[in-house]
């Protein structure tokens, strides 16, 4: 049986691991390192360099070296090299191809199957694009797994049967995730997850770069941001300084010949950066990790004291300020030191590959979807079919109907987010179900099904139950959710809960009124010869009042009109019932009597509860 590998495709570094005799082993690359920089360079001679060789030549080949492409995955971003445009998937595939080659060299056999990890807060387009990158690299992607979940799997598999609550704090090169999981008896279950797709070690590096640029400009008057080669050297020096400050109180940043002055004299950059200064210029970045942590605790419905262990993932968690913050947030809990933050995700991915291949027994991984999914229904309401933090894979269906008579098609708009009003959420995609046969409103039955697979990729199907006709969309367009969008979704959902509830109630009241008007008008038309004139005039007046209220903005008037119309409709039904009863008593024909009894049953439809229509 062909072997499967686990791959941590990171923003700044990537790792590949494989099971050897049931135990995960991190594979060293051809340069002898266990981590591979996620950097791709196109040399001028046509050669494509990946990893450390690409990083080594970045200063002299700035425009043709691509780094941190993971931040663009799932978007329409492209980079042009020699007249050809490359997508993030294609660049990521180059890194995956190198990892694949290194694993094949280590194992001495061809590799085709892989489990690839992504940040837990990656939305659908980003997951789909990651899978596509694997396919471009010649890999059969068995599963897309969330990074914190993989880390918990690697950490918790040998911890026995005792149930434990694990907090995974994952700060990588470009993304941040925090997840709460329960581990016990071979089951790894995600309780809640949150994060920021645009926060990572790169942002800390950039603050050092900005600090150096400002210092150099103040001393020499020269703006280094206009010099691409100088900026590349600054980026490399910043990363090195950040790493040194994790173990030292200060570091020296010395870059000779960084640029030249107006007289072509060479200039040197020589600065001392203390850990205190570094923490000061990056304090706001650190603070951005607090809100997702609090959100996860709230969503999981636990207190901080319920956390048994804290696992730090990602090289950026080596910064002392990060581990100090985690201690503060968890009430002084010491983060676990038994895992390598750079490698633990790949190890977990290899274990999951082993589970899928049958090499690892009695392990069940239960992941979740990070944000709610639903469609827009009548009144602009967001009807959620799948709530956030629902265990995946999952499938949910709900039946909707048309809003107008003889409506030939329905537009299905798929949204992701927490707000009650659809327009306030993120539109993932839309499609149309056409060919609905002419029918009165409320008659067609449209079944909408949301299916999230184990990779977290969404499929939506709309089916006309009457004709069997259906249409499907696999959500794969759109771009990644920015921090602002994610914050807005969750914060707005809390701040505007009352407003959203009122809007939803208003939409439901209006739908109810329209339905009652429609049903009553139809009932009068169908029973015109049986309706007493005085009763009919009262009902028609109530209908007119309801229509007038619906044309206005006063929801209280709509409610009052609905109540009045419901009362008059009931009187209408009662009048017809009594008239038919009198006819039956006067008749001596049993068959006629029986027929009239049937009509009595038909008339009772008025008393049935009115359902809110959705489209």
UniProtKB/Swiss-Prot annotation:
Return the annotated region ranges for Disordered.
580-615
Any Pfam family matching the protein: HSP70
Phosphoprotein among keywords? yes
Q: Which UniProt keywords apply?
A: ATP-binding, Chaperone, Nucleotide-binding, Phosphoprotein, Stress response
UniProt cross-references to InterPro entries, sorted A to Z: ATPase_NBD, Chaperone_DnaK, Heat_shock_70_CS, HSP70_C_sf, HSP70_peptide-bd_sf, Hsp_70_fam
Q: Which CDD domains match?
A: ASKHA_NBD_HSP70_DnaK-like
Q: Which GO terms describe its molecular function?
A: ATP binding; ATP-dependent protein folding chaperone; unfolded protein binding
Q: State what induces this protein.
A: By stress conditions e.g. heat shock.
Asked if the record carries the keyword Phosphoprotein, the reply is: yes
Cysteine pairs forming cystine bridges in this chain are none
**Domain of life of the native organism:** Bacteria
Q: Which PROSITE patterns match?
A: HSP70_1, HSP70_2, HSP70_3
Phosphothreonine modification, residue list: 175
- Compositional bias per record (Acidic residues), positions renumbered to this chain: 599-615
Comp. bias intervals (Low complexity): 580-598
Function comment? Acts as a chaperone.
Similarity-based family: Belongs to the heat shock protein 70 family.
The name on file for this protein is Chaperone protein DnaK
Q: Which organism is it from?
A: Nocardia farcinica (strain IFM 10152)
């Amino acid at each position: 049986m062909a072997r499967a590998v686990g791959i941590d495709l990171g923003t700044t570094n990537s790792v590949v691991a494989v099971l050897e005799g049931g135990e995960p082993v991190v594979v060293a690359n051809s340069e002898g390192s266990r981590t591979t920089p996620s950097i791709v360079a196109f040399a001028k001679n046509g050669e494509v360099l990946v990893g450390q060789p690409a990083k080594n030549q970045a200063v002299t080949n700035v425009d043709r070296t691509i780094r941190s492409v993971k931040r663009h995955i799932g978007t329409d971003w492209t980079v042009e090299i020699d007249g050809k445009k490359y997508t993030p998937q294609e660049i990521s595939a180059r890194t995956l191809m190198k990892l694949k080659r290194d694993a094949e060299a280590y194992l001495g056999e061809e590799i085709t199957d892989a489990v690839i990890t992504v940040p837990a807060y990656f939305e659908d387009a980003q997951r789909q694009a990651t899978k596509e990158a694997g396919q471009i690299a010649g890999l059969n992607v068995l599963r897309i797994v969330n990074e914190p979940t993989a880390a918990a799997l690697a950490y918790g598999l040998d911890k026995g049967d005792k149930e434990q609550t694990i907090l995974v704090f994952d700060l990588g090169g470009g993304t941040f995730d925090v997840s709460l999981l329960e581990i016990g008896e071979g089951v790894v279950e995600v309780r809640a997850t949150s994060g920021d797709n645009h926060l990572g070690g790169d942002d800390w590096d950039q603050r050092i770069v900005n600090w150096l640029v400002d210092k150099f400009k103040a001393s020499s008057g020269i703006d280094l941001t206009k010099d691409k080669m100088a900026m590349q050297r600054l980026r490399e020096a910043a990363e090195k300084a950040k790493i040194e400050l994790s173990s030292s109180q200060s570091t020296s940043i010395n870059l000779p010949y960084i640029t030249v002055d107006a007289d072509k004299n060479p200039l040197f950059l020589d600065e001392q950066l203390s850990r205190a200064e570094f923490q000061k210029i990056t304090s706001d970045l650190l603070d951005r990790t607090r809100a997702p942590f609090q959100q996860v605790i709230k969503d999981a419905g636990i207190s901080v004291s319920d956390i048994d262990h804290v696992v730090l993932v990602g090289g950026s968690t080596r910064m002392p300020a990060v581990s100090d913050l985690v201690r503060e947030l968890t009430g002084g809990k010491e983060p676990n030191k038994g895992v390598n933050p750079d490698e633990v995700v790949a190890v977990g991915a290899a274990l999951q590959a082993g589970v899928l291949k049958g090499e690892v027994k009695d392990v069940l991984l239960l992941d979740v979807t990070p944000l709610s999914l639903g469609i827009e229904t009548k009144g602009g309401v967001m009807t959620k079919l799948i709530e956030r933090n629902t265990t995946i894979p999952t499938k949910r269906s709900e039946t909707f109907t048309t809003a107008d008579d003889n409506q030939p098609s329905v537009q299905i708009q798929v949204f992701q987010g927490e707000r009650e009003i659809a327009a306030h959420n993120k539109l993932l995609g839309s499609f149309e179900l056409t060919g609905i046969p002419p029918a009165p409103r409320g008659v067609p039955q449209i079944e909408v099904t949301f299916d999230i697979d184990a990779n977290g990729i969404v499929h939506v199907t709309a089916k006309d139950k009457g004709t069997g006709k259906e249409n499907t969309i696999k959500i794969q367009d759109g771009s990644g959710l920015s921090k602002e969008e994610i914050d807005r979704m969750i914060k707005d959902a809390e701040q505007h809960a009352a407003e959203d509830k009122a809007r939803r109630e208003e939409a439901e009241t209006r739908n109810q009124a329209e339905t009652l008007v429609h049903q009553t008008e139809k009932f009068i038309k169908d029973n015109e010869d049986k309706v007493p004139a005085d009763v009919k005039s009262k009902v028609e007046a109530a209908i007119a009042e309801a229509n007038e209220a619906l044309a206005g903005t006063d929801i209280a008037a709509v409610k009052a009109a609905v109540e009045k119309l419901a009362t008059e409709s009931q009187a209408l039904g009662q009048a017809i019932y009594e008239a038919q009863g009198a006819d039956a008593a006067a008749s001596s024909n049993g068959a006629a009597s029986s027929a009239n009894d049937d009509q009595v049953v038909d008339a009772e439809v008025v008393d049935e509860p009115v359902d809110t229509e959705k489209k």
